[in-house]
Amino acid sequence: MRKIIVGSRKSKLALTQTNWFIDQLKALGLPYEFEVKEIVTKGDVILDVTLSKVGGKGLFVKEIEHALLTKEIDMAVHSMKDMPAVLPEGLMIGCTPKRVDPRDAFISKNGASFKELAEGAILGTSSLRRSAQLLAARPDLQVKWIRGNIDTRLRKLKEEDYDAIILATAGLQRMGWDDEVITEHLDETLCVPAVGQGALAIECREDDKDLLQLLAHMNDAITERTVAAERVFLHKLEGGCQVPIAGYATLKENDTIELTALVGSMDGSVLLKETVVGTNPEEVGLEAAGRLIKQGAKELILAANKEQQ
């Protein structure tokens, strides 16, 4: 019986996601054992600055990918939104399980909705994507950076001077806390989700055919296609955590993919947004990127990167 070593970050959410996925594999009743190996990533260690200042995309995966390449582990369960657009040679996304709620969750200290927040209220987020879109809707708000895992951020909301914070609904759902803490879900039209938000990425080595066969049982074709369109868009624009960039695709009638893509300025004063429909994920992603580039997306990205330096 083969033992599969599964790499995971040490956070409660990462371990919850990893153990959930292992349980799904065990339920298949195939001859495999599983062992979790906890790995500390750069993103877990550097907590005093925003993600965009310390390298953005890849902060939570590089050390895990190194362990995959050196065969210390066989596979890893990531949040898809943490995955860079391009993976190291020899690694691949072995499967994408069914996506859960991709929306952002708004959590306020006193139960006020986003619209009801007092003028000048302090909003906690460490995401340029969230801050740009929410400042576009409410320029009066003050954005204050907040880092740490879910529990830490919820504690900071209670104890510090934040009036509200934004977290991914998916993480709260996986922890079983969504009903307890969420004030409201932000509609995708108000705050377009991050590329891959709500989805998991199961990463493994390309040459591990045995494991790839096992993972195929857990792949969700709709999630795979929609996330692929989002990631092509992200790759074409070379966007990461350093840029206010968003992309969310859904499957519509007749097997068509509808992708809403967005690039913004850091302060939310400019938001470029396009919706593209098509059947081929790559073509949809490239078309969305192309349309935004024509509107000046590359210039916004350059400006955002300069502001981060």
Curated annotation (Swiss-Prot):
Cofactor(s) needed by this chain: dipyrromethane
Pathway(s) served: Porphyrin-containing compound metabolism; protoporphyrin-IX biosynthesis; coproporphyrinogen-III from 5-aminolevulinate: step 2/4
Entry GO terms, CC: cytoplasm
Catalytic reaction equation(s): 4 porphobilinogen + H2O = hydroxymethylbilane + 4 NH4(+)
Pfam families in UniProt: Porphobil_deam, Porphobil_deamC
Keyword Transferase carried by entry: yes
Transmembrane feature ranges: none
InterPro entries given in the database record: HemC, Porphobilin_deaminase_cofac_BS, Porphobilin_deaminase_N, Porphobilinogen_deaminase_C, Porphobilinogen_deaminase_C_sf
EC annotation from Swiss-Prot or TrEMBL: 2.5.1.61
The UniProt record lists the keyword Transferase: yes
Sorted UniProt keywords: Porphyrin biosynthesis, Transferase
Superkingdom, natural source: Bacteria
GO molecular function: hydroxymethylbilane synthase activity
Comment on bound cofactor: Binds 1 dipyrromethane group covalently.
Enzyme kind, highest EC tier: transferase
Assembly and interaction partners: Monomer.
HAMAP family: Porphobil_deam
Family designation: Belongs to the HMBS family.
Function: Tetrapolymerization of the monopyrrole PBG into the hydroxymethylbilane pre-uroporphyrinogen in several discrete steps.
UniProt name for this protein: Porphobilinogen deaminase
Organism for this UniProt entry: Bacillus cereus (strain G9842)
